[in-house]
């Protein structure tokens, strides 16, 4: 394979990040196909006149996010295909079509987008300057492998107040996105153990578990959350759940189901990975405590991120380890360099400490509550009895079950012809996927575009 990235040494972006982005972009564009072998670290380092460490860090990040896998005595192979990730951008068949698609003005209901127009850039800039003034040359030192102590302390305090999470700063590990933290977590456990995984569930997490030789045990999800009886029948060593806003269906795990899951984990000395996906955004009913906050036996690993509530590009996530896993977790983490810069961490710490974070999250909750109301009203008005809405009580997207004579793929293609991007749901399933359900993320779409986009769906589907 010919690798010809242009690595710009004059940029502030590290070379390994530039190399990582090159591979990621070319996989998304289809230029690097699933199964293709990547150059060895030594060969690529020599070819690009960079260190093997630079190549290794780029490959590690790609592997952590599920883009490549290492095969013993064979090397690194591309493991990415758009269909592997349920809501990734759908590829064009040619570079010309790809370029035309990128230049087109879409109404894009991607679930991962946020409304950046409300980001408090002036307050963030002030926090950046304050952190520079306060820490100065300390910012040039290598970051603590667990993350900066001040930020870890503030995260522990915030999680206790907002989600009832009980932890100290020594239990907090910071990383550049949940995939990297999951990669670290997988190495805390022995290979070939079994992990109960929500079906449907988060595809990227599944790929990371598989890449780390874990045995995936699909567990169905109903209106109350993951099915405990199926867990008891399968007896996995671990269970991965998204209880605040089930990744695909959008359901909120009931308090009764949470207690049952915790009881099972305690009785079987098993661990639960609680991915608090979209936990900040709930629109109806009383907030349900986190599993970690309810846990009395140290069986829950808690994961969260600032990506949805701040900006995805900031890439700051965190993982809370229970005390039985601390020693091994710290040992594994020490093998990696910290993936979030000191400056970014200390800027966020200033942002939280000065009260800007709480003001911002309150503002975004109000904004997204309004957008949710707009999308629900527009769907009911324009699409009416031809659809059923699901997952609307929390999070930043909804599902539509469509009662029309079109399958999922055709529904998406018809929408694209009218300038609207909606996304499939079926690829999140391992068994019995729905054939006529699509996902609409509303956070990153303007209020006027939400209304216009739903009107265009009505026209596209000839309702």
UniProtKB/Swiss-Prot annotation:
<keyword id="KW-0238">DNA-binding</keyword>
<feature type="DNA-binding region" description="H-T-H motif">
    <location>
        <begin position="41"/>
        <end position="60"/>
    </location>
</feature>
<dbReference type="GO" id="GO:0003677">
    <property type="term" value="F:DNA binding"/>
</dbReference>
<dbReference type="GO" id="GO:0009058">
    <property type="term" value="P:biosynthetic process"/>
</dbReference>
<dbReference type="Pfam" id="PF00155">
    <property type="entry name" value="Aminotran_1_2"/>
</dbReference>
<keyword id="KW-0804">Transcription</keyword>
<dbReference type="InterPro" id="IPR036388">
    <property type="entry name" value="WH-like_DNA-bd_sf"/>
</dbReference>
<comment type="similarity">
    <text>In the C-terminal section; belongs to the class-I pyridoxal-phosphate-dependent aminotransferase family.</text>
</comment>
<dbReference type="GO" id="GO:0030170">
    <property type="term" value="F:pyridoxal phosphate binding"/>
</dbReference>
<protein>
    <recommendedName>
        <fullName>Uncharacterized HTH-type transcriptional regulator YdeL</fullName>
    </recommendedName>
</protein>
<keyword id="KW-0805">Transcription regulation</keyword>
<dbReference type="Pfam" id="PF00392">
    <property type="entry name" value="GntR"/>
</dbReference>
<dbReference type="InterPro" id="IPR036390">
    <property type="entry name" value="WH_DNA-bd_sf"/>
</dbReference>
<keyword id="KW-0032">Aminotransferase</keyword>
<dbReference type="GO" id="GO:0008483">
    <property type="term" value="F:transaminase activity"/>
</dbReference>
<feature type="modified residue" description="N6-(pyridoxal phosphate)lysine">
    <location>
        <position position="308"/>
    </location>
</feature>
<dbReference type="InterPro" id="IPR004839">
    <property type="entry name" value="Aminotransferase_I/II_large"/>
</dbReference>
<dbReference type="InterPro" id="IPR015421">
    <property type="entry name" value="PyrdxlP-dep_Trfase_major"/>
</dbReference>
<dbReference type="InterPro" id="IPR051446">
    <property type="entry name" value="HTH_trans_reg/aminotransferase"/>
</dbReference>
<feature type="domain" description="HTH gntR-type">
    <location>
        <begin position="13"/>
        <end position="81"/>
    </location>
</feature>
<keyword id="KW-0663">Pyridoxal phosphate</keyword>
<dbReference type="GO" id="GO:0003700">
    <property type="term" value="F:DNA-binding transcription factor activity"/>
</dbReference>
<dbReference type="InterPro" id="IPR015424">
    <property type="entry name" value="PyrdxlP-dep_Trfase"/>
</dbReference>
<keyword id="KW-0808">Transferase</keyword>
<dbReference type="InterPro" id="IPR000524">
    <property type="entry name" value="Tscrpt_reg_HTH_GntR"/>
</dbReference>
